Amino acid sequence: MSKRDFYEVLGVSRDASERDIKKAYKRLAMKYHPDRNQGDESAADKFKEVKESYEILTDPQKKAAYDQYGHAAFEQGGGGFGGGGFGGGGADFGDIFGDVFGDIFGGGRRGGGQQRAQRGADLRYNMELSLEEAVRGVSKEIEVPTLVHCDTCDGSGAKKGSSAETCGTCHGHGQVQMRQGFFAVQQTCPTCHGKGKIIRPCNECHGQGRKQKTKTLNVKIPAGVDTGDRIRLSGEGERGEMGAPAGDLYVQVHVKEHHIFEREGNNLYCEVPVSFLMACSMAALGGEVEVPTLDGRVNLKVPTETRAGRMFRMRGKGVKGVRGGGVGDLIVKLVVETPVNLSARQKELLKEFDESCGGDAQLSTNQNLKGFFNGVKKFFDDLTS
């Protein structure tokens, strides 16, 4: 089955901006995330497809390769990150064609001789954050299996005490000439593999100049990050061969759903249930309702003649974005819990009860209302613990 176009997967045009691509990714990632679709293999596949599309289209080099060559740009074992918690990047797309045409025509690379040691692959680490961690910033310790510099040979790949010798097959050129009829074809030297030198391999890294190790890193996540944001740690990817520089590590952020707040940009949204009695009282007299924020509980003044479903904006109670732009707002929606199937006597008693409370009838036996305030209590207990 052929792969779908990455732009089609995200539902954006080919000239879409990075902001539009990120917005589309966030919407689809939330829709198909495994936490929301447990046991649904179709949703899991779509989530992977959406994530792959986002990673390609937000990387300038990979996007350029895809725009020119389509999926063929990543079918040679390079391009793109692997799955799981982290993954390795492949060879640069330009190098794929450099290898092919360089071998045939004896050019391709500058100098047409010894191969340069390749920079190490980039890695990706997927990090899940709570909303509180994303908003305030946090330091996280992570473990990343990778290839690191070999201390035994100091990255040279040669056995300690030995030195590199000129390859006798290609005489240090890194290439050999093969005659086929009337044609002379230059190919990578099979003895030194294009390096021009022969070494006695290091026992620790087997001549690669690098070895497998799990690194422990302390990653500082800046305040205000959101799902889809990516943090680059320069030089923390795989070490290159034979002393070549290391690649980079990209930390991909995913913010978990919150049981009270929903984030959209730098704004937060919250639904606050109020009892039927309290709603009636506030509609006539106005009043106050307690609202949770990221900084603690605050009282929201509700004017008279307030109807059910009205939205209130609490300025400066949202998120300070990682890219600036000021602090967002908290948008509060009052949801009235209406009792049903009341008899005439019950309605009369309800009215008397409201009057006896002096108009402050915030108490409710509704389970949704109880659940909300229990959730608020847990939220603030977690903040102070």
UniProtKB/Swiss-Prot annotation:
One of the Pfam families matching this protein, by short name: DnaJ_C
GO biological process, one term: response to heat
Residues reported to bind Zn(2+) 2: 167, 170, 189, 192
Cofactor(s) the protein needs: Zn(2+)
GO molecular function: ATP binding; heat shock protein binding; unfolded protein binding; zinc ion binding
Cofactor: how bound: Binds 2 Zn(2+) ions per monomer.
ZnF (CR-type) ranges: 137-214
InterPro entries noted in UniProt: DnaJ, DnaJ_C, DnaJ_domain, DnaJ_domain_CS, HSP40/DnaJ_pept-bd, HSP_DnaJ_Cys-rich_dom, HSP_DnaJ_Cys-rich_dom_sf, J_dom_sf
Main localization, broad class: cytoplasm
Swiss-Prot/TrEMBL CXXCXGXG motif repeat ranges: 150-157, 167-174, 189-196, 202-209
GO cellular component: a single term: cytoplasm
Location of the J domain: 5-70
Cellular localisation: Cytoplasm
Domain of life according to the entry: Bacteria
Entry keyword set: Chaperone, Cytoplasm, DNA replication, Metal-binding, Repeat, Stress response, Zinc, Zinc-finger
Ligand binding (Zn(2+) 1): 150, 153, 202, 205
Family affiliation: Belongs to the DnaJ family.
Function: Participates actively in the response to hyperosmotic and heat shock by preventing the aggregation of stress-denatured proteins and by disaggregating proteins, also in an autonomous, DnaK-independent fashion. Unfolded proteins bind initially to DnaJ; upon interaction with the DnaJ-bound protein, DnaK hydrolyzes its bound ATP, resulting in the formation of a stable complex. GrpE releases ADP from DnaK; ATP binding to DnaK triggers the release of the substrate protein, thus completing the reaction cycle.
Domain comment quoted from the record: The J domain is necessary and sufficient to stimulate DnaK ATPase activity. Zinc center 1 plays an important role in the autonomous, DnaK-independent chaperone activity of DnaJ. Zinc center 2 is essential for interaction with DnaK and for DnaJ activity.
Quaternary structure annotation from Swiss-Prot or TrEMBL: Homodimer.
Name of the featured protein: Chaperone protein DnaJ
Gene that this sequence comes from: dnaJ
